[in-house]
């Protein structure tokens, strides 16, 4: 099931938490994305997408799961089905009748959704890379740090050129950029509130990004840690998600493998296999350091859940090799605006398929009509 508000539920830590209505609408609108990562026999919690969308992706080789209501899902769980959410929370498990699992969602699991985890992982990664000539492109100048004292935070912010992040929230939310003098005082006031409420903030240097990527990993019950692939995406300076990228890799295959192996070794050292089972997405970035040398920062954010990268790794198989494409999620004025937009884009950028029925050019959509949120993309000509 698609529940990207899981981080809010984890922060709230109450079994009665309910996300804002607009985000509930967003979750319903985007539930169709789960079909891209479903397997035979799976059911997706949510309304079935429109027939046109289902047929389009079925012809591209996507498995079409059965879409079920929440009540039907609860019945299936009682009969032995396993609930696999986008991300876990006490509230989610409780609402689906899994009270024991909700009670087992301890403070330790809650810590896995804190940005402090990213600081710990990056520190371990840097220790692994330090002094090793073959890994010097991953040996970064400054690391992110957890700051719990107001005076230390203020000194860091007044130095400028930094990013201040709240401990809770992700995907570019809860972030203050400090690039100019006018940013300093508002950031300090904001960070004081976060330290008072959450106990700390994360401070990290600001780098002009050349590109961003997510290393996708899964930890299994038997203790295996598996590298699933590397995804590329576009975000703004604060790290807010913009677009998923297809055919626009910024790392070499060798670098992708190196980054994955470093992360797996770091997770093993931190003993995550005894504490967590499931998907992990570790965001990273490529930038030029002060000397103009290309650097790869392996860990800027850790997502202990599914990510859009998991979906994109599946979506990319539906495209002709070597094409360059992007897709994104957009909010429209209403459902009619989303439907009208699709009709106009279909006319302006007609779909072209290759001899294997894969997308070669044109406009495509990934989510259902009938909502004021839509996921859509285009293959660059």
Task: Specify the residue positions occupied by each region the protein language model found.
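Phosphate-binding site of ATP-dependent enzymes
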Residues: 187-237, 285-299
């Amino acid at each position: 099931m698609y529940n990207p508000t899981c981080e809010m539920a984890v922060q709230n830590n109450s079994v009665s938490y309910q996300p804002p209505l607009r985000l509930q609408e967003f979750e319903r609108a985007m539930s169709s994305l789960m079909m891209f990562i479903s397997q035979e026999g799976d059911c997706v919690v949510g309304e079935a997408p429109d027939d046109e969308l289902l047929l389009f992706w079925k012809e591209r080789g996507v498995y079409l799961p059965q879409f079920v209501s929440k009540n039907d899902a609860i019945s299936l769980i009682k009969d032995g089905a396993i609930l696999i959410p986008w991300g876990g929370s006490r509230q989610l498990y409780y609402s689906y009748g899994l009270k024991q699992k909700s009670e087992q969602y301890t403070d330790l699991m809650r810590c896995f959704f804190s940005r402090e985890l990213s600081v710990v992982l990056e520190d371990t990664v840097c220790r692994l890379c330090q002094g090793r000539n073959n890994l010097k492109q991953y040996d970064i100048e400054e690391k992110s740090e957890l700051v719990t004292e107001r005076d230390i935070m203020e000194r860091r912010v007044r130095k400028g050129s930094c990013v201040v992040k709240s401990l809770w929230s992700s995907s570019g939310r809860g972030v203050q950029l400090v690039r100019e003098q006018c940013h300093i005082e508002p950031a300090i006031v904001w960070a004081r509130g976060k330290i008072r409420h959450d106990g700390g903030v994360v401070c990290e240097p600001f780098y002009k990004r050349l590109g961003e990527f997510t290393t996708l990993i899964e930890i299994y019950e038997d203790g295996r840690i598996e590298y699933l692939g590397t995804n590329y995406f576009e975000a703004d300076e604060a790290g807010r998600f913009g677009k998923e990228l297809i055919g626009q890799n910024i790392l070499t295959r060798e670098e992708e493998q190196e980054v994955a192996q470093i992360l797996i070794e770091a997770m093993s050292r931190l003993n995550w296999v005894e504490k967590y089972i499931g998907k992990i997405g570790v965001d990273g970035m490529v930038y030029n350091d002060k000397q103009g040398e290309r650097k790869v920062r392996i860990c800027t954010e850790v997502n202990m859940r599914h990510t859009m990268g998991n979906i994109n790794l599946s979506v990319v198989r539906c495209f002709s090799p070597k094409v360059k494409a992007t897709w994104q999620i957009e909010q429209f004025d209403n459902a009619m605006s989303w439907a009208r937009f699709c009709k106009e884009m279909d006319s302006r950028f007609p779909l072209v398929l290759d001899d294997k029925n894969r997308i070669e050019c044109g406009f495509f959509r990934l989510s259902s009509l009938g909502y004021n949120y839509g996921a859509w993309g285009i293959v660059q000509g």
